[in-house]
Every structure is written in C-alpha cells, then in structure tokens.
C-alpha cells in the first residue's frame, strides 16, 4: 500500500495521523519511509551512540519549508513499529535548524483512545520537563560526529504554533500537488 492513501488526520490540526519511521529507544539508525512505496529505507547510521528519546515520524500529505513532510515526535513510554500509523494530538513544537535550514519537530501525544496516560496534556507546558530536556539534548547532539552537519535549537513553541505549522504544511502540500 502506498502511504499516500493515509490522510493527514480526520480533524486537522486538532488530530493528526503520524507514520512512525523510528521507534523510541531503538538502535542509532535513521530510517525513512519511501512515501510512494511504503518501504522503510535505512537513511544512515548515527555516528553518535544515541537513541531516539521518543517515536519519530511524519504527517502524510504535508510539506514543510524544508521540502519534507512535517516531522513529529510522539511522546509515549513504549516504542512503536516502523510503518505504523498512530493518531495524535499536537501539543508543541521544537524549533530547530540544521545544515539544510529550518527543521521544526512537532511534539504530539497519542489520542486518549490509544493511550489515556497523556489525556490531560493539551500544551507544551504540561509535558514533563524531563521529556523536553531529553528530546532537546538528543536533537542538539545527535549529529555531533557527522562531518558538515550541525543542529541549532531555537526553543519550544506551544500547541497553537504547532497547529499553525501543520495547517500551513497541508496548504503547501495541496498547492504543490499535481
């Protein structure tokens, strides 16, 4: 099945579908899903011996300023299988840039039906500071040993900013679609 058949979400931007590419706490391998075929490719092996602190994926049928779909960090105590789709609520955004330009990461929690443990989280200020520190540390350092690559963190934004980014990314995707 081509992943283009998976929608961005039923009630965007309040609820989004996230295709998982990298499970939480997995080996330091950067996977990327080929959007047309659905195949999971190894993009690269991270040079730093670090594990992703949360499940990492993207929202289908979105297009951000960097030319890629919207990246999403799914806060959940368990790893999810690559290629799985999880319905989430955006609660914040990690503002960052790298050698290729702006590269925001939407922070999301699963909807209550999937995991009720985070049903109370509506905005970034309700996310554990421990989670936020782990995520920030990972993204600030995961490219440290890769030549010509760098990352700069520009702080956190709330749910309203995350939802604005998602809305704009869907509009950009729709305006660029053939």
Curated annotation (Swiss-Prot):
* GO BP of this protein: phosphate-containing compound metabolic process
The catalytic activity, as recorded, is: diphosphate + H2O = 2 phosphate + H(+)
The prosthetic group or cofactor this protein requires is: Mg(2+)
Record bears the keyword Membrane: no
Q: Which UniProt keywords apply?
A: Cytoplasm, Hydrolase, Magnesium, Metal-binding
InterPro entries from the entry?
Pyrophosphatase, Pyrophosphatase_sf
Q: What is its main location?
A: cytoplasm
Positions annotated to bind Mg(2+) 2: 71
**MF (Gene Ontology):** inorganic diphosphate phosphatase activity; magnesium ion binding
The keyword Hydrolase appears for this protein: yes
Q: What is its EC number?
A: 3.6.1.1
What positions does the entry give for Mg(2+) 1 binding? 66, 71, 103
* Cellular component terms (Gene Ontology): cytoplasm
Q: May I ask which residue range the UniProt record assigns to the signal sequence?
A: none
Q: Which domain of life is it from?
A: Bacteria
Q: Where in or outside the cell?
A: Cytoplasm
Positions that bind substrate: 30, 44, 56, 142
Q: Which CDD domains match?
A: pyrophosphatase
Summarize the protein's role. Catalyzes the hydrolysis of inorganic pyrophosphate (PPi) forming two phosphate ions.
- Assembly and binders: Homohexamer.
Give the family this protein belongs to, as stated in its UniProt record.
Belongs to the PPase family.
HAMAP family, per database record: Inorganic_PPase
The protein in question is named Inorganic pyrophosphatase
Q: What is the lineage of its organism?
A: Bacteria, Pseudomonadati, Pseudomonadota, Gammaproteobacteria, Lysobacterales
- What gene name is given for the protein in this entry? ppa
